[in-house]
Amino acid sequence: MLQRRFISSSGIKRLLHRESNKVMHTVFFKVRYYSTELIKKKHKEDIEDWVKAQLKDSSTISGVYESRNKLDWMDSITKSPSSLDILKNQYNIVKDKDFGILWKQKFESADPDILMTIISLSTNQKVLFSIQQLLILINSLHFLKRDYDIGQIYTTYEQFTPLLASHTDKGTYGQFIEIMLVVQHNLHHFDVCETLFAEYIKYCKVKPQMISLGLNSFIRSNNTQLAVEFYTQAITNPDTFPITEKQLFEFLRCMERYLDMSSMKHIFYLWLKVKCGDEQSSSTNLPSFKTLAIIHRMLLRFSNTDELNDFLTNPVVLSTGYTSSVQFELIEFCHSLYCIKGDRTKSIDDSILMERVDKFITRLNNNISTRKELYMSVVQAYVSTNNFENLKVILEKIQRDNDISIDGSFHLCISRYFVNTNQFEGLFKYYRSVVKTTDGKTRLRPAFIQQLWSCAVNVYPMLAKEITNDLLVTLKRSQYSKCLTWVYTFLQENAHIHTRKINGGEDSSLSGFNAVDFERFEEFKKKVSHNDVYGAELVISNSLKEGIAPQFSFLYSVLALCLRNSLTGLARVVDVILRTRFRYIPLKVDILWLKWEIISNYRSFEKLSAEHLKELEFKLKEFERVHQKELSVQNYLQLTQICFHTRDFKYACYLISQARKNLDTSNNKQWMMYYMTSLKLASRMHESERFSRILKDWNCNHRASLITPGCIRQIKGFMKYFEKRPAYISTAASIDNKEIKDRIDELVLRYVDYKYQGLENMRKLTLFLKEWFDEEISLLKLEQNERKMKLFEENKKEEE
């Protein structure tokens, strides 16, 4: 079960109502005396002799420690006075006089070797620097954007912080906590951020931007409910927590990523009530058009007419003028494009679309950011419908707009076309020839790697584990994680392989879950495998009550697993959750239920009556008739598989012919699914000639190059239908089994070639990413050198 971290709501309340006159107590230590006469020697020798002098001195640090209320992370020390006494007796703190002689200059210049020296002194020599001394180095490192090194300092000194804080003034300690909070957020150490944020709001004058940082940390560490709870209590304490409209926008934008509409409505309407409910409220508290657009977009997406009307007629919303703005019209227009994605009965009328785009461009002449949003929405619409020709048309229009450049966000959207159509080589070429060759304008970002990674795994599923391991070995290097602080977390969150049984073997791919849902699904599978129904129910229940709201892919996978394991009651609950949370429910959900109904009915009777069998066949045909315009290739093939249970092979032939008509001939995966289902149908019909003809067609089709070990295994299994049941096969329709085996052998050779191609592309991808990472590191070092010069100049001015 996922555990809540940080502090309770009562803990929040105590922090919210802190004492304004609270001061940090100062404690005086008796520090051992040591000589500095050796400073005439080399600096390294100075330090060594100084440390030796410390070790020879038998006196101990002593002083008075006035205990203060601490949070959980300090409890291990402060709950037991003897623990702090032990630290006092074991560790020496550098005297300011000697720090100025031996260390200050190196701290100010952020000497490259100083970090290892600090770690070594604390670990091996029991020597510590004060927080005030450390801040000199930390500020220099932060200016140079060496957050990884600051993180190392925090890790080394975390256990000593209560000791050092006890003789540090409140202002200095607050500076230390604030910069550490920012750095840990940059490092994506969100659990640590929770702890530091608790200290920050206790000892610092809270800044608005730090509230955003804290809220984001809660959400990213799966403490969504705590984030909402903190926001709810903090918004009513403006003197302590100066939340501005910008924080509202950033909080909602963060929540939008997880489609948590319930929390978003609470956040938004609470703002209107507290910040805009009074006639004397400041106009700066009115929600901006950007904020209103988020709520508007989400309400349209969840298709709740009553709630949408309530939002649009709200007095505060009306007072902003949003409903009569071009931004309002743009959201409505973009939503109409979004709806096309989920409805095959609709298509984009290119002439009307471009006409409306041109009108928006004219009206948005002075609003560059909103104009960019318009272009992005149209690009997304064409990508979602795999319309590459018209995608090029809109890109040409963007290129003619002097105020808009095709940057990384556009590249991510455009390259999604290649991911959707499983064209790894096209995607690789696009990144190599377009994205990376922009003279450093398009910098490396995690989403670029994720696209290349997931596309490679989708196109070469038999190499999913090899590709993932190769990327991990290549990118999980210390020189990368030190400079690109997001690398380690990114790899950990995305290196989840999801394996499922398909086509007689295993089909592996990247899970598609976020890190939280992946953990939930693994726990759910474990409960189901142990027949722990109550535990499985608890996983679903907790996913709704705790942390980030569950996403569609997680709930769909849970539903499928429930039906496969006959957990019908729980499956119905999950189905209700799905249909409540998401506006667009793909047909594959209804097909899951149709398959379950037909199979469960079929298994309920040893021998179905002709009447009952016809009833099941009618349900299947009626489903196809009602949803004919919406059915995708995959849907038709799923319905064909259901026909095998009713033994309605004639109707199965019709369904598979419909799948062929709708098949995207450039999509490798669709070809594989089509051929495998066709071969299964031929074997069930005991038509060896048809079986051989399909194999021949597959071998001749160079666009259908995706073949997996599972395909080969299952095709060989199909052969048993002809070998064991010759009585069912008519002489006229039968052919020599040797011919079929020869064609299977040919398919095996094609598989070997395809796997070799995948290994070669895997090698190219790894080299490409390594090269891109190295170039990014070089750019970062150049930028760091420029900042070093500025830092040197600043230090020189201070000395003068």
Swiss-Prot record:
<protein>
    <recommendedName>
        <fullName>Protein PET111, mitochondrial</fullName>
    </recommendedName>
</protein>
<comment type="function">
    <text>Required for translation of the mitochondrial gene for cytochrome c oxidase subunit II (COX2).</text>
</comment>
<dbReference type="GO" id="GO:0070131">
    <property type="term" value="P:positive regulation of mitochondrial translation"/>
</dbReference>
<keyword id="KW-0010">Activator</keyword>
<keyword id="KW-0809">Transit peptide</keyword>
<dbReference type="GO" id="GO:0005743">
    <property type="term" value="C:mitochondrial inner membrane"/>
</dbReference>
<dbReference type="GO" id="GO:0033617">
    <property type="term" value="P:mitochondrial cytochrome c oxidase assembly"/>
</dbReference>
<dbReference type="GO" id="GO:0005739">
    <property type="term" value="C:mitochondrion"/>
</dbReference>
<dbReference type="GO" id="GO:0005759">
    <property type="term" value="C:mitochondrial matrix"/>
</dbReference>
<comment type="similarity">
    <text>To yeast YHR160C.</text>
</comment>
<dbReference type="GO" id="GO:0045182">
    <property type="term" value="F:translation regulator activity"/>
</dbReference>
<keyword id="KW-0810">Translation regulation</keyword>
<keyword id="KW-0496">Mitochondrion</keyword>
